[in-house]
């Protein structure tokens, strides 16, 4: 099952004057692909997006450390919704749907994928947790 959204360039502004040109959800591969107006293309596995959800439930409140999300190796994405002209809301198949992913956040997650993924794997190991359910 493959869904693709062509986004109107003038509607999706983000900081640094970036626009999102295209968002594709591939449910079979469990990933989202986003093309920005500078032609950078980033592939976001569902697990990665779930782990780095910007929701308060995951990020914590004020001075709390982010909650470690584990056991989501096989998580899927049920739906993507546009939020205004600056973000998307992702509904995951574990029923988490409270994170609003701004274009700025998504660009950062794409640019720093290797670094952030490595940090996540190290934290899993430190806390004796697994990606497997």
Language-model-derived ranges and their functions:
Residues 2-133:
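Motif-centric detector for short Cys/His coordination patterns
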């Amino acid at each position: 099952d493959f869904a693709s959204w062509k986004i109107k360039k003038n509607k999706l502004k983000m900081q640094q004057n970036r626009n999102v040109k295209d968002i594709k959800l591939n449910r079979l591969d469990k990933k989202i692909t986003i093309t920005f107006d500078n032609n950078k293309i980033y592939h976001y596995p569902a697990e990665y997006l779930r782990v780095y959800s910007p929701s308060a439930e995951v990020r914590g409140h004020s001075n709390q450390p982010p909650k470690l999300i584990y056991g989501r190796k096989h998580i899927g994405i049920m739906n993507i919704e546009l939020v205004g002209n600056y973000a998307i809301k992702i509904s995951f198949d574990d029923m988490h749907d409270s994170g609003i992913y701004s274009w700025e956040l998504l660009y950062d997650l794409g640019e720093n994928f290797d670094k952030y993924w490595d940090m996540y794997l190290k934290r899993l190991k430190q806390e004796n947790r697994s990606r497997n359910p």
